[in-house]
């Protein structure tokens, strides 16, 4: 069996690529190691889509419950620095949209279920078939020929290992906590982020539905703060009042707490032969700006554009040029975002008094300079597209 793109990983990005290419008449096959299980209903983990990512989903007919964010306030918890971002500053309806991870994943998986091989995975990629097709071997020993192999299988990408990509990674020494909460507020389209020595604390509205939660919390804490044996729940209970005081709101946790260690990673190259890394398979960053999934969609968009352009050309598709164009468009942009997030993490975790003063004045200063604010918002919203 042959196909244009074999996609390893039936997550959000892998299924999006399959759906987008299928709409454009390009054959795909998704290989997913997990079972085709019933849709998960858990409503805890959320992701934040920028306007461009939402537009990409709208274009392939994906609709899930959303919560709109029109205003974001960023606060230096150790000082008086504040910066406000508003959607009207970039002439958009909203700055971003919050969706439940499972809602989006289930919708995309359902759309692509007929093109997915479940409970299987790639174990070999053979580039020596001919100059156009490669051959992939699956765990069940079946072989498939494909023009491209797209690794969309997450930060521990099996495809990256099979193709011997060179990994770079670093540990932030932090743990992220996420849970949903009920918060009484006058404006359900506002989000807040507080930087302090008790962690980076983000509050965002969550989609309404058959649950009592109104908001989602994403809280990054230093591992040293929980190394004394305290549980995540105990640490949260002891420190939540600090953020309630800063934000002048009562936060009532509604769900269990999910937690995961924070690391970044990237690869020196995104392409090798017929193989390409996309989304979390290629890179991961600190979640403080909520941009991880949006970088994945930007990757997927660029890859799909190049494949569609190559596929629709009158001559035989130049697969090497297609992949090189994708890599040029995305690799440096993703690395810049990773380094930028690392910079902000180090600035806001610093206990140096001079740096504390500089960041305090810096936030307030940027808040008064419209063109700088507009630049940051445009970048985060996906409008600075390559």
Regions found by a protein language model. Give the residues of each.
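FAD/FMN-dependent oxidoreductases across multiple families
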Residues: 225-311, 316-318
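Glycine-rich FAD cofactor-binding loop and adjacent beta-loop-alpha segment at the N-terminus
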Residues: 4-6, 10-71
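C-terminal helical "tail/cap" subdomain of flavin- and related membrane-associated enzymes
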Residues: 305-386
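Active-site flanking residues adjacent to catalytic metal/cofactor-binding acidic residues
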Residues: 8, 31, 152, 279, ...
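Conserved FAD-binding catalytic core of PHBH/FMO-like flavoproteins
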Residues: 142, 147-249, 257
């Amino acid at each position: 069996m042959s196909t244009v793109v074999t996609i390893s990983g039936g997550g959000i990005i892998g299924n999006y690529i399959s759906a987008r290419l299928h709409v454009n008449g390009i054959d795909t096959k998704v290989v997913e190691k997990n079972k085709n299980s019933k849709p998960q209903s858990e409503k805890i983990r959320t992701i934040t889509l920028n306007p461009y990512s939402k537009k990409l989903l709208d274009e392939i007919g994906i609709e899930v419950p959303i919560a709109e964010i029109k205003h974001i306030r960023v606060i230096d918890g150790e000082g008086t620095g504040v910066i406000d971002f508003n959607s009207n500053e970039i002439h958009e309806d909203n700055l971003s949209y919050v969706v439940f991870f499972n809602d989006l994943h289930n919708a995309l998986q359902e759309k692509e279920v007929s093109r997915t091989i479940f409970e299987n995975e790639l174990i070999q990629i053979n580039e020596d078939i001919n100059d156009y097709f490669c051959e992939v071997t699956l765990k069940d020993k079946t072989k498939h020929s494909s023009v491209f192999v797209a690794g969309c299988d997450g930060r521990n990408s099996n495809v990256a290992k099979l193709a011997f990509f060179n990994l770079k990674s670093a540990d932030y020494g932090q743990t992220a906590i996420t849970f949903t909460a009920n918060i009484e507020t006058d404006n359900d389209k506002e989000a807040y982020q507080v930087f302090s020595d008790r962690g980076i604390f983000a509050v965002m509205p969550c989609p309404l539905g058959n649950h009592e939660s109104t908001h989602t919390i994403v809280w990054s804490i230093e591992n040293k703060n929980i190394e004394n044996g305290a549980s995540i729940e105990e640490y949260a209970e002891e420190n939540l009042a600090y953020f309630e005081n800063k934000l002048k709101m009562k936060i009532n946790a509604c769900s269990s707490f999910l937690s995961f260690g924070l690391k970044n990673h990237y690869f020196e190259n995104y392409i090798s032969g017929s193989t390409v890394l996309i989304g979390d398979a290629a890179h991961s960053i600190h979640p403080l700006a909520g941009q991880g999934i949006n970088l994945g969609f930007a990757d997927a968009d660029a890859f799909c554009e190049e494949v569609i352009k190559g596929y629709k050309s009158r001559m035989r598709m130049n697969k090497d040029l297609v992949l090189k164009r994708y890599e040029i468009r995305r690799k440096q942009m993703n690395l810049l975002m990773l380094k930028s997030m690392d910079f902000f993490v180090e600035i806001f975790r610093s206990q140096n008094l001079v740096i504390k003063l500089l960041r305090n004045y810096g936030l307030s200063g940027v808040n008064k300079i419209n063109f700088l604010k507009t630049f940051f918002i445009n970048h985060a919203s996906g409008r600075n597209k390559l």
